[in-house]
Amino acid sequence: MGPLPRGRVLYELGVRLISFDRPGYGGSDRMASRLVSDVAADVLAIANHLDIERFAVIGRSGGGPHALACAAMLPDRVTRAGVLGSIAPRGAEGLDWYAGMSESNVREFTTAAAAPESLIEELGLTAARIKADPMSHVATLGPEMPESDRRVVADGGIRMLLAKNFAEALRHSAAGWIDDALAFCAPWGFNLADIQVPVLLWHGEDDVFSPAAHARWMAGQIPTAELLVLPHTAHFGALEVVPDVLSWLIR
């Protein structure tokens, strides 16, 4: 889900937050040809190992589809799901999937769908540049960001957290990033309509990395969804509301 809330915030909420690297990121081994739905088995294994019977899930940005997968596929274990700034399935009927999306994300996803070998080469080169200077990658996002995102990322602490997050995710290779892009553009392996646990879909109205229309479309597919779209807020605004979403998850 990206940079985590401070320990003091979690303590005051009474939340035990367990995060993990998806396959190919950080210290996790790659799982080639994985689907979004494959995450449910990983989460189940972690919960069983820690003797956690019931739990909520939260995912931001690329973690959003994976949180939804857990909600759909682990109904006897998952209590609630919080999803912040997530894309919808690429085959979403009636949704103009690329409308309002940043040029860089359009290029990444169209390449993933049409020319996977080119994606591997392109993201591999980009990952090498990020590993060499992760802070500069944060700066390169600026021209595509709406003003509300620039305001969030102007905070030096946030910039440092994002840079550390990028560096850790790519410390071994770009495999996780590549496999995520491929999985997002393929069938996810579950149906949103099958979700029966409460889901909060949080989204910034001005998001250009995963447009708000995606959240609105998913809200129409998930029978238990609560949609919250904030005006004058974009993708990185999710970092500021994670404590609020955590509070919702433990109701």
Task: Report each predicted region and the residues it spans.
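Alpha/beta-hydrolase
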Residues: M101-F190
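Conserved alpha/beta-hydrolase "acid-adjacent" motif
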Residues: V208-H214
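Conserved alpha/beta-hydrolase
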Residues: L10-R30
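Conserved hydrolase catalytic core segment
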Residues: E53-W97
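Catalytic active-site module of serine/aspartate enzymes centered on a nucleophile-bearing elbow/loop
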Residues: T224-R251
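Conserved acidic catalytic loop of the alpha/beta-hydrolase fold
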Residues: S37-A56, H66
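The serine-hydrolase catalytic nucleophile loop
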Residues: M1-R8
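Short beta-strand/loop motif that positions the catalytic acidic residue
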Residues: I195, L201-H203, D207
